[in-house]
A protein has these predicted regions:
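Extracellular glycan-interacting surfaces
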Residues: 2-490
Length: 490
């Protein structure tokens, strides 16, 4: 009996080796997946194998579905629900305890395109911010560096937040648009997240629901609510994009979608691009103090429709005036001849004054990448009827060297000549663009920061309602605050 046991025990390694060899040399899903991984890693430079991006790449491939050969992000929310259910079941078992987590904190946020002061906070200190990869957050006292940001929900089906607004008729109602359209192009660093539509809260952000009618809107570039004779009307910029060679087309089309029933139904309001059967793709929506709606455009997937400003008092189909003079001006340029993105900023204290930033770019013949700069800054003194050029910040078009990505403007609440713009850094003009002050320096991040440090790439500039001094800035490094925006050097 003892000899049989010894013999059986000695055969165990042989059996295990055979199983390993069978698994190794049997063609199948595992082998195909190994070949897929080898192919992917072979294209990655490995000079620094312990660098953060290599760790992130490893984490990425650990979550790839071998059959799909991509990360099935559409399953994330279901996986979260399953994990939560298992944890709840575990809590009922004898001796089990819930997992406890301790927040470690961070002194830098990620790319933040959506920034909003909370209209319901009597103290005027609460703010909201949306990250393009990190979801929606709020801070009960954004004026204090010690006040922590709180996540709304880490497990929304989509954490790519691009824009946010509230209803001026009912400030308890908030809207959040998902999907980051401005990087959803063939560019040197594709980093776009496809959206799932528009989220809505009717209790000042305590709870949220996804509006079912918007689930085919792939990218929401901007969202505003207008008070139309005491009724709330939503305007959403809906566009399409491309990510890693795959086009994500919003349905039924790009355009400015209008809803007068809280988002239950929508109508596309913009005209078609000149010479096309597709509506303009909105990059920015601006509502002036008298209610006039302005829309700045961006290129669509067909590379059409950029560098255009539209305005309307009614906001409905057939009511729009189109200003596209700068298409021909840009196309006549020797280098930066592709009409780009348009950003708008109206003066709260003077409905006649509106500013427009217009980008212009080119497409690389060698890579196919889209590039764009800050082509022009315009001002209108008659509510968009006519426009004239102002000076650009020092350095010309390079002040906004990534205007497809980082491009923003804001006008002081009480001075129509005081204008902030943002590209790579923050700039300010106190005389309607005649001259400019360079206020921030992103490179100070390498030297410990300081009072002039704001992270690179400006995406949001928001004054607190009625205050010319308090202002929030959204950038690739999170949210920055100043309490003296009206000074020469905040």
């Amino acid at each position: 009996m003892k000899r049989k046991s010894i013999l059986l025990f000695s055969l165990v390694p042989v059996i295990l080796a055979c199983i390993a060899l069978i698994n190794l040399f049997t063609p199948g899903e595992r082998e195909r997946y190994d070949l897929f991984l080898a192919e992917q890693y072979s294209s990655v430079a490995r000079e620094l194998p312990d660098s953060p991006e290599m760790a992130a790449l490893q984490d990425h491939y650990m979550t790839v579905d071998p059959e799909l050969q991509r990360v099935p992000v559409e399953r994330l929310y279901d996986a979260y629900l399953t994990a939560r259910e298992l944890q709840e079941q575990l809590a009922f078992k004898s001796g089990s305890e819930p997992i406890e987590w301790e927040e470690t904190g961070s002194n830098m946020g990620g790319r933040t395109r959506a920034v909003m002061w909370d209209p319901n906070d009597a103290a005027g200190k609460k703010a909201w911010a949306g990250g393009v990869t990190g979801g929606l957050w709020y801070n009960d006292d954004v004026t204090s560096g010690l006040s922590m940001w709180q996540p709304v929900d880490d497990f929304w089906p989509n954490l790519s937040i691009c824009c946010m607004t509230y209803d001026p008729v009912d400030p308890q109602t908030f809207y959040v648009g998902t999907g980051e359209p401005f990087t959803a192009r063939v560019i040197y660093r594709e980093s776009s997240g496809v959206g799932t539509g528009i989220w809505k809260s009717e209790d000042a952000g305590a709870t949220w629901t996804l509006i079912p009618s918007t689930q085919d809107f792939k990218y929401i570039s901007d969202i505003e609510v207008r008070d139309e004779n005491g009724s709330s009307v939503i305007y959403a910029g809906v566009v399409s994009g491309s990510y890693h060679g795959i086009n994500h087309q919003s349905q039924p089309s790009d355009g400015l979608y209008r809803s007068d029933d809280g988002g239950a139904t929508w109508e596309q309001a913009l005209p078609d691009i000149n010479g096309s059967n597709k509506p303009y793709a909105p990059a920015d929506i601006e509502i002036g103090p008298d209610g006039r709606i302005f829309v700045g455009t961006m290129k669509n997937l067909d590379m059409e429709g950029g560098a255009t400003i539209l305005w309307s008092d009614a906001g409905t189909a057939g009511s729009w005036t189109v200003f596209d003079d700068y298409i021909a001006i840009i196309e006549a340029q020797p280098e930066y001849n592709v009409p780009g993105r348009v950003i708008l900023a109206s003066a709260p204290s003077d409905a006649s004054v509106v500013y427009a930033l217009i980008g212009s770019g080119y497409i690389s013949n060698s890579t196919g990448f889209n590039y764009a700069r800050g082509g022009f800054i315009l001002r209108s003194d008659d509510k968009g009827e006519t426009w004239s050029e102002t000076n650009q910040p020092e350095g010309g078009i390079d002040w906004a060297s990534l205007s497809w990505h980082a491009f923003i403007a804001a006008v002081s609440p009480d001075n129509p000549d005081e204008l902030y713009v943002g590209g790579l850094d923050v700039w300010k003009s106190a005389n309607a663009g005649s001259s400019w002050s360079h206020l921030s320096d992103w490179s100070l991040m390498y030297w410990g920061g300081g009072p002039d440090y704001v992270h690179a790439d400006q995406h949001a500039q928001v004054y607190k309602d009625g205050s010319p001094e308090e202002m929030l800035f959204g950038s690739d490094g999170g949210v920055f605050y100043t309490s003296n925006a009206g000074s020469g050097n905040p």
